[in-house]
C-alpha cells in the first residue's frame, strides 16, 4: 500500500513540474508606453506563498507576525528606441518570506484570484 501511495505522490509531483507555491523569483513581462511607443519590459518579481498559521487568539495586542514573499529589489533603466525618455523598472534579485512591513506593503487579506501555478 505504501508503494502505491508513493507512486501516486511522485506522479502528481511530476504532473505539476512547473508549479511552485513557495516564495520564488518569477520572470514576467509588461508593456510600457513612452513617446507613443509601446514595448515590453522583461523583469523578475517575487511570487508565491509563505506559510502562516493562525495561533489561538489571546488578546488584541497578540497577533501573529504575517509573512510575505519579498526580497531585494533594484531598479534598471531601459531606453526605448527612438525615444529620449528612459523607463525605470524594478527587478527582484532574490526572494524570501519576511515579516510584512505595513509602512510600504499591504498586509491584509488578498481578495483576488490566486492561480494554482505562477
Swiss-Prot record:
Name the residues that span the membrane.
Answer: none
Database matches in Gene3D superfamilies: Cystine-knot cytokines
What domain of life is recorded for the organism? Eukaryota
Species, as recorded:
Trichopodus trichopterus (Three spot gourami)
* CC annotations in GO: cytoplasm; extracellular space
Q: Which UniProt keywords apply?
A: Disulfide bond, Glycoprotein, Hormone, Secreted, Signal
Q: In which compartments does the protein localize?
A: Secreted
Q: Which Pfam families match?
A: Cys_knot (PF00007)
Query: What is the official name of this protein in its record?
Result: Gonadotropin subunit beta-1
Give the glycosylated residues.
27
- Enumerate the Gene Ontology biological process terms: G protein-coupled receptor signaling pathway; ovulation
Q: Which GO terms describe its molecular function?
A: hormone activity
Q: Where is the signal peptide?
A: 1-18
Q: Is Hydrolase given among the entry's keywords?
A: no
Amino acid at each position: 500500500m505504501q508503494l502505491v501511495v508513493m507512486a501516486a505522490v511522485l506522479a502528481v509531483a511530476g504532473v505539476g513540474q512547473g508549479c511552485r507555491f513557495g516564495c520564488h523569483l518569477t520572470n514576467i513581462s509588461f508593456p510600457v508606453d513612452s513617446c507613443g511607443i509601446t514595448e515590453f519590459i522583461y523583469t523578475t518579481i517575487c511570487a508565491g506563498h509563505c506559510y502562516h498559521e493562525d495561533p489561538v487568539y489571546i488578546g488584541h495586542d497578540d497577533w501573529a507576525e504575517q509573512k510575505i514573499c519579498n526580497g531585494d529589489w533594484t531598479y534598471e533603466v531601459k531606453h526605448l528606441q527612438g525615444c529620449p525618455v528612459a523607463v525605470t523598472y524594478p527587478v527582484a534579485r532574490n526572494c524570501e518570506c519576511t515579516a510584512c512591513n505595513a509602512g510600504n506593503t499591504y498586509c491584509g487579506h488578498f481578495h483576488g484570484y490566486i492561480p494554482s501555478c505562477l
